[in-house]
Amino acid sequence: MFGFETCRPKLAGAFLGALLLSVPANALTEQYETPPEQDPATLLDGKELGPGYAVLSPVRGDGFLRIYQVQTDLGVEQIEGDGMLKLRLHEIQVLIALDSLKNDASFVDGLKQAAMKPVEFVESTVTDPVGTAKNTVSGVGRMFGRLTKGVEAAVSGKGGSPAELAKSITGQAKARRELAVDVGVDPYTFYRPLSEKLDETASVTTAGNWTVSAITSLLPGGIIVNAARQADNFRNLIVDSTPTELQERTSSVLRAVGVPEVTNAKLMGNPFYTASEKAAIAYQMQAMPGVKDLYLIAEKAADADSRDLAYFQLRRVVLMETYNSTVSPLGDIKLVSGIPVALRRDGIAAIVMPFDHVAWTQTVAQTFSAMHEGLGALPFPPTGVDFLITGDVTSMAAERIAAFGWEITGNYPIPKGPVF
């Protein structure tokens, strides 16, 4: 993941692999261009430098996504795509904000109290689960079921460690999820420094009267996320569900929208998505009940074999649902030259992609030429093509794409939410 020269961008390779079939000859012989190098100061509107990071110049691309080099305390990290960059910079911002809590004496005292809490409770839970549960849980219901499952798993060795079980029983695990969502980050983030800081910060809730609200009240302005009303249900799902429950609910939703069991299992087992991101894919698909053959979208998402490809597919699902609900209703999904393409109910094809900066490279030319021919080969070809992307296109790319008869819509924003 580190070092531009030694890491070949995977997205371009993935599209090329899917589109080596039926590539028109003119796409292989025409003139191409090299994606332009860009100044991060211009791209990021002066935000190329900030506390804890520096986006290095120049920014390169592969014809689909921009490729960034970001300097942090951990070294230089290669980040592929505008979405991934926005995600990482926000994670760094939250990490620094949480770290600033150490300047508050009462918070530091809370951390010390949490660190001194005895571990006998956990040990007795594992060695005598029934006896301890009688002393710590009253009544029945979902929480009791969680505790029983967690203790049984710990005793059998099939679950998490005693420390993880303790976090669940004491409420620290839920506090961590609530804290993460309140500051606009994924509780299951892959960014290890932030994950460790969330653990440390949430641990204070086991000491005294500390709550997540008390913690967030100490954070600098602009960090707390005010979720839109329509996002409340998803927020509650992430906060209130244990990892096991979230996985079960996500899989159930995928099943309900027609995703085959093989694809369901493959997506749920894909290590390049977080648990929250898998849930986001499932619930975005559920929000498109009138669209046929959505399983093709899930199949492509399940095939992601790298983090950048996974985040690209996640953003594409979000963008497609947004298009369906705000631009034009979609009718069904067709596999065109190996890529799922949406057909609108009015007969127009919607090629909806979270591309950053489209340049007319050989791979881009092959990709779009094959898609153009594939659309024309459908039993009922579309009456037009709406090519909608989140970024922009070079002059050459715009000219060549327009020659296909496609209508180009650029700089279409990803809606505000947990996906950047």
Give the residues covered by each predicted segment:
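N-terminal secretory signal peptides that target proteins for export/translocation
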Residues: 1-8
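Bacterial N-terminal signal peptides
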Residues: 13-23
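Cationic, glycine-rich low-complexity segments
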Residues: 34-157
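Membrane-penetrating hydrophobic segments
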Residues: 107-126, 195-216
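Membrane-engaging insertion elements
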Residues: 141-159, 228-267
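Acidic-basic catalytic patches of nuclease active cores, encompassing PD-(D/E)XK
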Residues: 257-339
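Conserved catalytic cores of phosphodiester-cleaving nucleases, focusing on short active-site segments
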Residues: 317-379, 385-389
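Domain-level recognition of nuclease-like catalytic cores that cleave nucleotide substrates
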Residues: 390-420
